[in-house]
Amino acid sequence: ITALTMEYQVTNTETSEQYQVREAYRLRYTSTRIYLLAYERWTDKILEPGRQLVEDGKLSFGIQSSEPVYMKNTEENVVGFIEQGQLWSYDYGQNRLSRVYGFTDGQDGRADWKEHDFRLLKVDDTGSMDFLLYGYMNRGRYEGRSGVMFCHYDALMNTVEELFFVPSDQSYAAMKEDIGDLAVQNGNGKAWLCWQGNLLQINLDDHSVTILARNVNASDLQVSDSGLLAAWNDEDSGDICLLNTSTGVVSRIEAGDGEVLKTLGFMEEDLIYGAGYSSDIYTDQAGKEMQPLYCVTIRDQAGKDVRQFEYSSKGKYVSGVTIVENRIDLTCVAKASDGSWQEALSEPITYTSETHTNLLKLSTVYDEVHRNEYVLTYGGNIRKGSMKQPNVRLVLYEGSRIVDAGDASVKQYLAYRYDGSAEGFETLTEAVQYA
């Protein structure tokens, strides 16, 4: 049995639109035949910056194999988006499109190798943004190397500056699973990154590294919507550590005697966490440690516990949480007569937040020829005239901005699909079940 992938570009001869096509095959060979066991095909429209990007307030992504990744600023007049291994920014008020970062140069096909990706971290009201670039570096200072690069794009100066680079000897698929949810810089010379189970604090002046915590699993680390707050479990004490990235101060929520606290998530800037008894901790069939929680607390940004929910009186304990918009669903378990834990009905929590009218909305539209296409619709004012396309320059610097992240402190198990993608799991049993 073998698996292979193919990538190529096709052009619509009538409209000159270009598409990136990727095909994956899973084959079995015998002495007389070849069997096709699985086949998938993905098609993505390639952005054409030479054309007017927005018409009638609509930015069309066209045919895409998955939902476009984008981030908008609070005023919703600037949007950053990722397209075919490149990072773009569009300012509706200025009618300005900028290619923030990308390896493709239109001349060398090797620059189109897409074993890398971006993560948008922040877009401010000027259109400037922070972002991560991770994977294999096709060109530039780190050409031929793999790693994670933290960058800042200045929309007013049209420049991109590398803040630091973490080298890696792992594959792109493995690196994608090793980057935690925390990646932020506060504009005052400090940055934070969760990498391979270590919580790193980086001094951007001398690029020294302080490891705030080790053995931090992805399920234990929670980050607020804005990146202002991050919380994780201290497995030694059972406490919760809470980092304010604006000040760099780490505070603690202390567990009581015989108790263990667990982070569950953030609703905007409010932390959701639970408390359980250490004697109730058990290991499930997949070999994963489970911690039933007898109560759940919501703590606001100021550090005040504003709401508390206790379920043990109903015979229920919380085992997990799902957050969708303003609704919190708590997954529950109950203790059976033989002492084992069984699934129980979930408990909902309604969260009240300020109503907000979205100027930017992503939707799908139907077309007779293309079928479903993704469109980003803008409800504000757009500057008329020809679209500006300024050149974004890289900031040159002397010396090195490579940081030493230390050894990995968390073991991950990767399950690979036949198309080359991978999913990371905390236990071997989970990885085998997925595969």
Give, region by region, the residue ranges found by the protein language model.
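Short, surface-exposed charged micro-motifs
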Residues: 24-26, 78-79, 120, 191, ...
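A short hydrophobic beta-strand element
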Residues: 2-10, 127-133, 271-276, 328-332
